[in-house]
């Protein structure tokens, strides 16, 4: 926390002039310390024999260094930031040029150092998981990412979540302090009020930006679905319980009878205080629960509900999320009796929208979601539904929407229609000429269509647009190998390693190809 102050200054300095109590408490809160320079915390080595990986954490001259040894190749990076206030743990970020990458090593409060979430399932471990604007939206206040793809970081520093994330821009309020020109979430209507929390504490299976929107376009006081929609997926796999995401509190609370029967009175801030929690959290929570359930603390069941009962430990038990190891999440369903998550009983899965976006983009959002989730989860019927919905969109909506075009390219490539995929890819580039993803899609479409010369030129253009996009480098490497252009292949690998000389995968690839 002190390191964050030293580099960033106080969160909400201008707000503190009139609101010293709130800002002082917020500076100690989890959101007020969402990102910071890394604390000098050294640790033991992380060993993964099955992956032939060893990661070391050290501190040199006050700087945290993460070192990787994989199959005899070593790499080490200075850590630029730590994400998380430390209540659960810290994830770490390195900077390579204009790009940010997640370290494969994280620190967990309960278990210490281990692989970052998801890396335990990967065949190879490296510092190559890019952190983009979508990742950083809920962890930093000033994520200055530029370009259509939101991958290139242009700022000097990343700062913790600030006051404006919940209260909106304070410029007018500072010039003329008034309750009329600042957002107070507690005084908003239910949908706008809940959206303030849902911008980060609602995940679903995926979230999609509406056409023409970026993550920074959301402003407190607006319904979140005007900017982005959250897609829910109910998987009815027999004998398996539904998944819980790490930030699925909003979905769980919506299932709670307490919330449903409160008429909208029970919401996030009923129990949580963004400016900082109380020191006697158990007592505070007991009082909140007993404001509606006082009878359970006395006459109804003195045997089990005494005056000092800890309501949360029984009715909001800890759960282990499926997607992030080593962490715990409180069950926000507020169950009467501890109960597992519902078991499915029938095959199939359905998608739905958490809240409806503007009517004109609803069909589009469902189409892109069905196709995306169907592909990621290997649900062919869901993918087929996405194809059907996409093809039913009016041509104007299809042709002017990069996300829709990207989905259509995927469809055409899978259906072995490279010429049609090329048409969609060229249109996507017209809309977003700086998009490396659009350029890469065209390269793949050209290659599938047999135009290797065109594919080569487009892959080189993709690399120029975004040197961090390893798929482009890899595709071009194998194209040169197919064409037996050994000198061009070697020069390409050297060029990549000139940009990122420590990358394990490309060093291994260079060594393998050199032996052939």
Predicted regions and their residues:
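Primarily the internal scaffold of c-type cytochrome electron-transfer domains
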Residues: 13, 21-85, 89-96, 115-120, ...
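Helix-start (N-cap) detector for alpha-helical repeat units in TPR-like alpha-solenoids
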Residues: 401-403, 436-437, 470-471, 504-505
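Short coil turns that delineate tetratricopeptide repeat
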Residues: 398-399, 433, 467, 501
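Canonical positions in the second alpha-helix
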Residues: 393, 427-428, 461-462, 495-496
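Register position in tetratricopeptide repeats
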Residues: 414, 448-449, 482, 512-516
